[in-house]
Protein backbone atom coordinates (compact mmCIF):
# COMPACT_ATOMS: atom_id res chain seq x y z
CA UNK A 1 0.00 0.00 0.00
CA UNK A 2 2.71 2.46 0.99
CA UNK A 3 4.62 1.48 -2.16
CA UNK A 4 2.03 3.37 -4.20
CA UNK A 5 2.36 6.40 -1.93
CA UNK A 6 6.15 6.44 -2.20
CA UNK A 7 5.91 5.99 -5.99
CA UNK A 8 3.82 9.15 -6.14
CA UNK A 9 6.10 11.08 -3.78
CA UNK A 10 9.14 10.01 -5.84
CA UNK A 11 7.88 12.33 -8.59
CA UNK A 12 8.73 15.24 -6.31
CA UNK A 13 11.70 13.81 -4.42
CA UNK A 14 13.86 11.06 -5.92
CA UNK A 15 14.84 9.93 -2.43
CA UNK A 16 11.56 8.03 -2.17
CA UNK A 17 12.81 5.62 -4.85
CA UNK A 18 14.64 3.83 -2.03
CA UNK A 19 11.35 2.13 -1.15
CA UNK A 20 11.50 0.23 -4.43
CA UNK A 21 14.26 -1.94 -2.96
CA UNK A 22 12.99 -5.33 -1.80
CA UNK A 23 15.56 -5.63 0.97
CA UNK A 24 14.47 -2.34 2.56
CA UNK A 25 10.79 -3.22 2.38
CA UNK A 26 11.51 -6.67 3.83
CA UNK A 27 13.35 -5.08 6.77
CA UNK A 28 10.50 -2.61 7.25
CA UNK A 29 8.10 -5.57 7.16
CA UNK A 30 10.05 -7.25 9.97
CA UNK A 31 10.11 -4.10 12.08
CA UNK A 32 6.46 -3.21 11.43
CA UNK A 33 5.23 -6.68 12.40
CA UNK A 34 7.48 -6.64 15.46
CA UNK A 35 6.18 -3.25 16.64
CA UNK A 36 2.57 -4.28 16.05
CA UNK A 37 3.16 -7.42 18.13
CA UNK A 38 4.68 -5.46 21.01
CA UNK A 39 1.94 -2.81 20.96
CA UNK A 40 -1.11 -5.01 20.38
CA UNK A 41 0.15 -8.04 22.33
CA UNK A 42 -0.35 -6.93 25.97
CA UNK A 43 -3.94 -5.66 25.61
CA UNK A 44 -4.87 -8.66 23.47
CA UNK A 45 -3.46 -11.07 26.07
CA UNK A 46 -5.43 -9.29 28.80
CA UNK A 47 -8.63 -9.82 26.82
CA UNK A 48 -7.77 -13.43 26.02
CA UNK A 49 -7.36 -14.23 29.72
CA UNK A 50 -11.12 -14.61 29.82
CA UNK A 51 -10.82 -17.60 27.46
CA UNK A 52 -8.19 -19.91 28.94
CA UNK A 53 -6.93 -23.03 27.14
CA UNK A 54 -8.35 -26.36 28.37
CA UNK A 55 -5.58 -28.93 28.83
CA UNK A 56 -5.86 -32.55 27.63
CA UNK A 57 -6.63 -34.86 30.52
CA UNK A 58 -4.42 -37.55 28.92
CA UNK A 59 -1.46 -35.23 28.37
CA UNK A 60 1.71 -34.92 30.49
CA UNK A 61 0.89 -34.17 34.12
CA UNK A 62 3.36 -31.27 34.04
CA UNK A 63 0.95 -29.46 31.70
CA UNK A 64 -1.91 -29.36 34.19
CA UNK A 65 -0.51 -26.15 35.67
CA UNK A 66 -0.98 -24.50 32.26
CA UNK A 67 -4.76 -24.74 32.43
CA UNK A 68 -6.28 -21.30 32.05
CA UNK A 69 -3.38 -19.81 30.09
CA UNK A 70 -4.82 -17.52 27.38
CA UNK A 71 -5.01 -19.07 23.93
CA UNK A 72 -5.82 -17.92 20.37
CA UNK A 73 -2.70 -15.73 20.50
CA UNK A 74 -2.13 -16.67 16.88
CA UNK A 75 -4.58 -13.88 16.06
CA UNK A 76 -1.80 -11.48 17.04
CA UNK A 77 0.52 -13.15 14.51
CA UNK A 78 -2.05 -12.91 11.73
CA UNK A 79 -2.80 -9.25 12.42
CA UNK A 80 0.91 -8.38 12.40
CA UNK A 81 1.64 -10.37 9.23
CA UNK A 82 -1.35 -9.01 7.32
CA UNK A 83 -0.76 -5.39 8.34
CA UNK A 84 2.97 -5.41 7.59
CA UNK A 85 2.50 -7.18 4.26
CA UNK A 86 -0.30 -4.89 3.11
CA UNK A 87 1.76 -1.85 4.06
CA UNK A 88 5.05 -2.76 2.38
CA UNK A 89 4.37 -5.32 -0.36
CA UNK A 90 3.51 -4.68 -4.00
CA UNK A 91 -0.20 -5.44 -3.96
CA UNK A 92 -0.29 -5.94 -7.73
CA UNK A 93 1.76 -9.13 -7.26
CA UNK A 94 -0.51 -12.21 -7.36
CA UNK A 95 1.85 -14.27 -5.21
CA UNK A 96 1.38 -11.83 -2.34
CA UNK A 97 -2.37 -12.31 -2.47
CA UNK A 98 -2.04 -16.08 -2.78
CA UNK A 99 0.13 -16.42 0.32
CA UNK A 100 -1.97 -13.93 2.31
CA UNK A 101 -5.28 -15.57 1.42
CA UNK A 102 -4.02 -19.08 2.19
CA UNK A 103 -2.55 -17.96 5.52
CA UNK A 104 -5.70 -16.14 6.62
CA UNK A 105 -8.11 -18.85 5.45
CA UNK A 106 -6.20 -21.56 7.30
CA UNK A 107 -6.19 -19.21 10.26
CA UNK A 108 -9.97 -19.07 9.90
CA UNK A 109 -10.18 -22.87 10.14
CA UNK A 110 -7.99 -22.70 13.23
CA UNK A 111 -10.21 -19.99 14.72
CA UNK A 112 -13.29 -22.19 14.42
CA UNK A 113 -11.36 -25.06 16.01
CA UNK A 114 -10.19 -22.89 18.91
CA UNK A 115 -13.64 -21.37 19.36
CA UNK A 116 -15.24 -24.80 19.71
CA UNK A 117 -12.61 -25.81 22.26
CA UNK A 118 -13.32 -22.74 24.34
CA UNK A 119 -17.10 -22.73 23.94
CA UNK A 120 -17.52 -26.40 24.85
CA UNK A 121 -14.47 -26.48 27.16
CA UNK A 122 -13.30 -29.47 25.11
CA UNK A 123 -9.60 -29.61 24.18
CA UNK A 124 -10.41 -31.73 21.07
CA UNK A 125 -12.06 -28.84 19.21
CA UNK A 126 -13.24 -29.20 15.61
CA UNK A 127 -13.56 -32.80 14.44
CA UNK A 128 -10.79 -34.02 12.16
CA UNK A 129 -13.27 -34.68 9.36
CA UNK A 130 -14.45 -31.08 9.14
CA UNK A 131 -10.98 -29.68 9.70
CA UNK A 132 -9.46 -31.68 6.84
CA UNK A 133 -12.43 -30.94 4.61
CA UNK A 134 -11.97 -27.18 4.79
CA UNK A 135 -8.20 -27.45 4.62
CA UNK A 136 -8.61 -29.55 1.48
CA UNK A 137 -11.02 -27.09 -0.12
CA UNK A 138 -8.61 -24.19 0.42
CA UNK A 139 -5.50 -26.12 -0.66
CA UNK A 140 -7.09 -27.57 -3.79
CA UNK A 141 -8.54 -24.20 -4.71
CA UNK A 142 -5.18 -22.43 -4.56
CA UNK A 143 -3.42 -25.35 -6.27
CA UNK A 144 -5.81 -25.19 -9.23
CA UNK A 145 -5.49 -21.41 -9.39
CA UNK A 146 -1.70 -21.56 -9.50
CA UNK A 147 -1.70 -24.38 -12.04
CA UNK A 148 -3.96 -22.60 -14.51
CA UNK A 149 -2.31 -19.19 -14.08
CA UNK A 150 1.31 -20.38 -14.33
CA UNK A 151 3.21 -18.11 -16.70
CA UNK A 152 6.45 -20.11 -17.02
CA UNK A 153 7.14 -23.86 -17.05
CA UNK A 154 9.32 -23.64 -13.92
CA UNK A 155 6.26 -22.75 -11.83
CA UNK A 156 4.93 -26.31 -12.12
CA UNK A 157 8.20 -28.25 -12.03
CA UNK A 158 9.62 -30.13 -9.05
CA UNK A 159 13.16 -28.97 -8.34
CA UNK A 160 15.46 -31.65 -6.91
CA UNK A 161 18.03 -30.20 -4.47
CA UNK A 162 21.75 -31.05 -4.60
CA UNK A 163 21.49 -31.87 -8.33
CA UNK A 164 22.11 -29.31 -11.06
CA UNK A 165 19.40 -28.76 -13.68
CA UNK A 166 17.23 -31.61 -12.40
CA UNK A 167 13.59 -30.58 -12.69
CA UNK A 168 10.60 -32.91 -13.01
CA UNK A 169 7.69 -31.68 -15.12
CA UNK A 170 4.74 -32.50 -12.87
CA UNK A 171 1.89 -31.63 -15.19
CA UNK A 172 -1.41 -32.19 -13.40
CA UNK A 173 0.38 -33.85 -10.48
CA UNK A 174 1.43 -30.33 -9.48
CA UNK A 175 -2.05 -29.85 -8.01
CA UNK A 176 -1.70 -33.01 -5.92
CA UNK A 177 1.77 -32.06 -4.69
CA UNK A 178 0.64 -28.56 -3.74
CA UNK A 179 -2.30 -29.99 -1.82
CA UNK A 180 -0.15 -32.35 0.24
CA UNK A 181 2.56 -29.76 0.90
CA UNK A 182 0.15 -27.08 2.14
CA UNK A 183 -2.15 -29.34 4.17
CA UNK A 184 0.73 -31.46 5.45
CA UNK A 185 2.79 -28.46 6.51
CA UNK A 186 -0.19 -26.86 8.23
CA UNK A 187 -0.96 -29.92 10.33
CA UNK A 188 2.72 -30.65 11.01
CA UNK A 189 3.25 -27.24 12.61
CA UNK A 190 0.02 -27.69 14.55
CA UNK A 191 1.23 -31.02 15.97
CA UNK A 192 4.55 -29.43 16.94
CA UNK A 193 2.87 -26.59 18.81
CA UNK A 194 2.66 -28.43 22.11
CA UNK A 195 5.32 -26.70 24.21
CA UNK A 196 5.98 -23.04 24.94
CA UNK A 197 7.71 -21.50 21.92
CA UNK A 198 8.48 -24.88 20.36
CA UNK A 199 6.76 -24.27 17.01
CA UNK A 200 7.11 -20.53 16.53
CA UNK A 201 10.91 -20.16 16.36
CA UNK A 202 11.38 -23.02 13.86
CA UNK A 203 8.63 -21.38 11.81
CA UNK A 204 10.53 -18.09 11.91
CA UNK A 205 13.79 -19.77 10.90
CA UNK A 206 12.25 -21.73 8.03
CA UNK A 207 10.21 -18.73 6.90
CA UNK A 208 13.29 -16.52 6.87
CA UNK A 209 15.21 -19.12 4.85
CA UNK A 210 12.36 -19.37 2.34
CA UNK A 211 12.60 -15.59 2.03
CA UNK A 212 16.20 -16.02 0.89
CA UNK A 213 15.07 -18.57 -1.69
CA UNK A 214 12.32 -16.19 -2.83
CA UNK A 215 14.78 -13.33 -3.26
CA UNK A 216 17.14 -15.52 -5.29
CA UNK A 217 14.37 -17.04 -7.42
CA UNK A 218 12.93 -13.62 -8.20
CA UNK A 219 16.25 -12.22 -9.43
CA UNK A 220 17.24 -13.53 -12.87
CA UNK A 221 20.97 -13.04 -12.26
CA UNK A 222 21.02 -14.81 -8.90
CA UNK A 223 18.75 -17.59 -10.15
CA UNK A 224 21.01 -18.30 -13.11
CA UNK A 225 24.16 -18.17 -10.97
CA UNK A 226 22.73 -20.50 -8.30
CA UNK A 227 21.12 -22.89 -10.77
CA UNK A 228 17.57 -22.46 -9.47
CA UNK A 229 14.49 -21.63 -11.57
CA UNK A 230 13.81 -17.97 -12.25
CA UNK A 231 10.27 -17.12 -11.12
CA UNK A 232 9.50 -13.47 -11.95
CA UNK A 233 6.95 -12.79 -9.20
CA UNK A 234 8.66 -14.70 -6.40
CA UNK A 235 10.90 -11.87 -5.21
CA UNK A 236 8.06 -9.92 -3.64
CA UNK A 237 7.46 -12.81 -1.24
CA UNK A 238 10.51 -11.57 0.68
CA UNK A 239 8.29 -8.87 2.16
CA UNK A 240 5.78 -11.44 3.39
CA UNK A 241 8.59 -13.57 4.82
CA UNK A 242 9.91 -10.51 6.61
CA UNK A 243 6.48 -9.87 8.10
CA UNK A 244 6.28 -13.52 9.18
CA UNK A 245 9.68 -13.31 10.87
CA UNK A 246 8.78 -10.09 12.69
CA UNK A 247 5.37 -11.38 13.78
CA UNK A 248 6.85 -14.69 14.92
CA UNK A 249 9.58 -13.05 16.98
CA UNK A 250 7.07 -10.62 18.45
CA UNK A 251 4.82 -13.49 19.47
CA UNK A 252 7.75 -15.46 20.90
CA UNK A 253 8.28 -12.56 23.31
CA UNK A 254 5.00 -13.57 24.98
CA UNK A 255 5.07 -17.30 24.15
CA UNK A 256 8.55 -18.13 25.50
CA UNK A 257 8.64 -20.46 28.51
CA UNK A 258 6.69 -19.98 30.71
CA UNK A 259 4.14 -18.83 28.14
CA UNK A 260 1.88 -15.88 28.78
CA UNK A 261 -0.28 -16.93 25.84
CA UNK A 262 -0.67 -19.93 23.55
CA UNK A 263 -0.75 -19.72 19.77
CA UNK A 264 -3.77 -21.96 19.33
CA UNK A 265 -4.81 -23.55 16.06
CA UNK A 266 -5.56 -20.12 14.62
CA UNK A 267 -1.82 -19.49 14.59
CA UNK A 268 -0.36 -22.97 14.09
CA UNK A 269 -2.53 -23.98 11.13
CA UNK A 270 -1.98 -20.59 9.48
CA UNK A 271 1.80 -20.55 9.93
CA UNK A 272 2.15 -24.11 8.69
CA UNK A 273 0.09 -23.34 5.61
CA UNK A 274 2.17 -20.20 5.03
CA UNK A 275 5.39 -22.23 5.01
CA UNK A 276 3.83 -24.78 2.68
CA UNK A 277 2.55 -22.30 0.11
CA UNK A 278 5.81 -20.32 0.25
CA UNK A 279 7.76 -23.48 -0.57
CA UNK A 280 5.38 -24.20 -3.45
CA UNK A 281 5.67 -20.69 -4.88
CA UNK A 282 9.48 -20.68 -4.84
CA UNK A 283 9.58 -24.33 -6.00
CA UNK A 284 11.43 -25.65 -2.95
CA UNK A 285 9.06 -28.28 -1.59
CA UNK A 286 11.84 -30.81 -1.03
CA UNK A 287 14.02 -28.23 0.70
CA UNK A 288 11.08 -27.43 3.01
CA UNK A 289 11.03 -31.13 3.90
CA UNK A 290 14.68 -30.79 4.99
CA UNK A 291 14.47 -27.45 6.79
CA UNK A 292 11.21 -28.35 8.50
CA UNK A 293 12.61 -31.68 9.68
CA UNK A 294 11.40 -31.09 13.23
CA UNK A 295 7.84 -30.71 11.95
CA UNK A 296 8.26 -33.83 9.80
CA UNK A 297 9.58 -35.96 12.66
CA UNK A 298 6.81 -34.80 15.00
CA UNK A 299 4.20 -35.79 12.42
CA UNK A 300 5.82 -39.14 11.65
CA UNK A 301 5.98 -39.93 15.38
CA UNK A 302 2.20 -39.55 15.61
CA UNK A 303 1.63 -41.68 12.49
CA UNK A 304 3.93 -44.43 13.77
CA UNK A 305 2.35 -44.35 17.22
CA UNK A 306 -1.18 -44.72 15.84
CA UNK A 307 -0.21 -47.42 13.32
CA UNK A 308 1.75 -49.43 15.88
CA UNK A 309 -1.05 -49.31 18.45
CA UNK A 310 -3.71 -50.35 15.93
CA UNK A 311 -1.62 -53.18 14.46
CA UNK A 312 0.12 -54.57 17.53
CA UNK A 313 -1.56 -52.97 20.53
CA UNK A 314 1.80 -51.51 21.57
CA UNK A 315 3.08 -47.95 21.54
CA UNK A 316 6.49 -47.04 20.15
CA UNK A 317 6.77 -43.83 22.16
CA UNK A 318 5.68 -43.09 25.69
CA UNK A 319 3.49 -40.39 24.19
CA UNK A 320 3.18 -38.71 20.80
CA UNK A 321 4.03 -36.23 19.34
CA UNK A 322 7.72 -36.81 20.01
CA UNK A 323 8.24 -33.80 22.29
CA UNK A 324 5.88 -35.36 24.85
CA UNK A 325 7.93 -38.58 24.75
CA UNK A 326 11.00 -36.68 25.93
CA UNK A 327 8.97 -34.85 28.58
CA UNK A 328 7.75 -38.12 30.07
CA UNK A 329 11.32 -39.45 30.00
CA UNK A 330 12.15 -36.64 32.41
CA UNK A 331 13.53 -33.91 30.17
CA UNK A 332 12.59 -30.44 31.44
CA UNK A 333 10.36 -28.58 28.99
CA UNK A 334 12.95 -25.84 28.24
CA UNK A 335 15.55 -28.50 27.34
CA UNK A 336 13.20 -30.13 24.82
CA UNK A 337 12.37 -26.75 23.30
CA UNK A 338 15.92 -25.48 22.94
CA UNK A 339 17.24 -28.77 21.53
CA UNK A 340 14.49 -28.82 18.91
CA UNK A 341 15.42 -25.21 18.08
CA UNK A 342 19.08 -26.19 17.67
CA UNK A 343 18.14 -29.04 15.36
CA UNK A 344 16.08 -26.62 13.26
CA UNK A 345 19.01 -24.21 12.95
CA UNK A 346 21.17 -27.06 11.65
CA UNK A 347 18.50 -28.23 9.19
CA UNK A 348 17.89 -24.70 7.91
CA UNK A 349 21.62 -24.29 7.26
CA UNK A 350 21.60 -27.57 5.33
CA UNK A 351 18.63 -26.32 3.33
CA UNK A 352 20.38 -23.05 2.51
CA UNK A 353 23.46 -25.01 1.47
CA UNK A 354 21.43 -26.48 -1.41
CA UNK A 355 21.71 -23.08 -3.08
CA UNK A 356 25.39 -23.78 -3.75
CA UNK A 357 25.80 -27.54 -3.46
CA UNK A 358 24.58 -28.76 -6.85
UniProtKB/Swiss-Prot annotation:
<keyword id="KW-0472">Membrane</keyword>
<dbReference type="GO" id="GO:0008963">
    <property type="term" value="F:phospho-N-acetylmuramoyl-pentapeptide-transferase activity"/>
</dbReference>
<keyword id="KW-0997">Cell inner membrane</keyword>
<feature type="transmembrane region" description="Helical">
    <location>
        <begin position="337"/>
        <end position="357"/>
    </location>
</feature>
<feature type="transmembrane region" description="Helical">
    <location>
        <begin position="166"/>
        <end position="186"/>
    </location>
</feature>
<keyword id="KW-0479">Metal-binding</keyword>
<dbReference type="GO" id="GO:0009252">
    <property type="term" value="P:peptidoglycan biosynthetic process"/>
</dbReference>
<dbReference type="Pfam" id="PF00953">
    <property type="entry name" value="Glycos_transf_4"/>
</dbReference>
<keyword id="KW-0961">Cell wall biogenesis/degradation</keyword>
<dbReference type="GO" id="GO:0071555">
    <property type="term" value="P:cell wall organization"/>
</dbReference>
<feature type="transmembrane region" description="Helical">
    <location>
        <begin position="95"/>
        <end position="115"/>
    </location>
</feature>
<keyword id="KW-0132">Cell division</keyword>
<feature type="transmembrane region" description="Helical">
    <location>
        <begin position="71"/>
        <end position="91"/>
    </location>
</feature>
<feature type="transmembrane region" description="Helical">
    <location>
        <begin position="261"/>
        <end position="281"/>
    </location>
</feature>
<comment type="similarity">
    <text>Belongs to the glycosyltransferase 4 family. MraY subfamily.</text>
</comment>
<comment type="pathway">
    <text>Cell wall biogenesis; peptidoglycan biosynthesis.</text>
</comment>
<dbReference type="GO" id="GO:0051992">
    <property type="term" value="F:UDP-N-acetylmuramoyl-L-alanyl-D-glutamyl-meso-2,6-diaminopimelyl-D-alanyl-D-alanine:undecaprenyl-phosphate transferase activity"/>
</dbReference>
<keyword id="KW-0573">Peptidoglycan synthesis</keyword>
<feature type="transmembrane region" description="Helical">
    <location>
        <begin position="21"/>
        <end position="41"/>
    </location>
</feature>
<keyword id="KW-0808">Transferase</keyword>
<keyword id="KW-1003">Cell membrane</keyword>
<dbReference type="GO" id="GO:0046872">
    <property type="term" value="F:metal ion binding"/>
</dbReference>
<dbReference type="GO" id="GO:0051301">
    <property type="term" value="P:cell division"/>
</dbReference>
<keyword id="KW-1133">Transmembrane helix</keyword>
<protein>
    <recommendedName>
        <fullName>Phospho-N-acetylmuramoyl-pentapeptide-transferase</fullName>
        <ecNumber>2.7.8.13</ecNumber>
    </recommendedName>
</protein>
<feature type="transmembrane region" description="Helical">
    <location>
        <begin position="286"/>
        <end position="306"/>
    </location>
</feature>
<feature type="transmembrane region" description="Helical">
    <location>
        <begin position="133"/>
        <end position="153"/>
    </location>
</feature>
<keyword id="KW-0812">Transmembrane</keyword>
<feature type="transmembrane region" description="Helical">
    <location>
        <begin position="234"/>
        <end position="254"/>
    </location>
</feature>
<dbReference type="GO" id="GO:0005886">
    <property type="term" value="C:plasma membrane"/>
</dbReference>
<dbReference type="InterPro" id="IPR018480">
    <property type="entry name" value="PNAcMuramoyl-5peptid_Trfase_CS"/>
</dbReference>
<dbReference type="GO" id="GO:0008360">
    <property type="term" value="P:regulation of cell shape"/>
</dbReference>
<dbReference type="InterPro" id="IPR000715">
    <property type="entry name" value="Glycosyl_transferase_4"/>
</dbReference>
<feature type="transmembrane region" description="Helical">
    <location>
        <begin position="197"/>
        <end position="217"/>
    </location>
</feature>
<keyword id="KW-0131">Cell cycle</keyword>
<keyword id="KW-0460">Magnesium</keyword>
<dbReference type="InterPro" id="IPR003524">
    <property type="entry name" value="PNAcMuramoyl-5peptid_Trfase"/>
</dbReference>
<keyword id="KW-0133">Cell shape</keyword>
<dbReference type="Pfam" id="PF10555">
    <property type="entry name" value="MraY_sig1"/>
</dbReference>
<comment type="function">
    <text>Catalyzes the initial step of the lipid cycle reactions in the biosynthesis of the cell wall peptidoglycan: transfers peptidoglycan precursor phospho-MurNAc-pentapeptide from UDP-MurNAc-pentapeptide onto the lipid carrier undecaprenyl phosphate, yielding undecaprenyl-pyrophosphoryl-MurNAc-pentapeptide, known as lipid I.</text>
</comment>
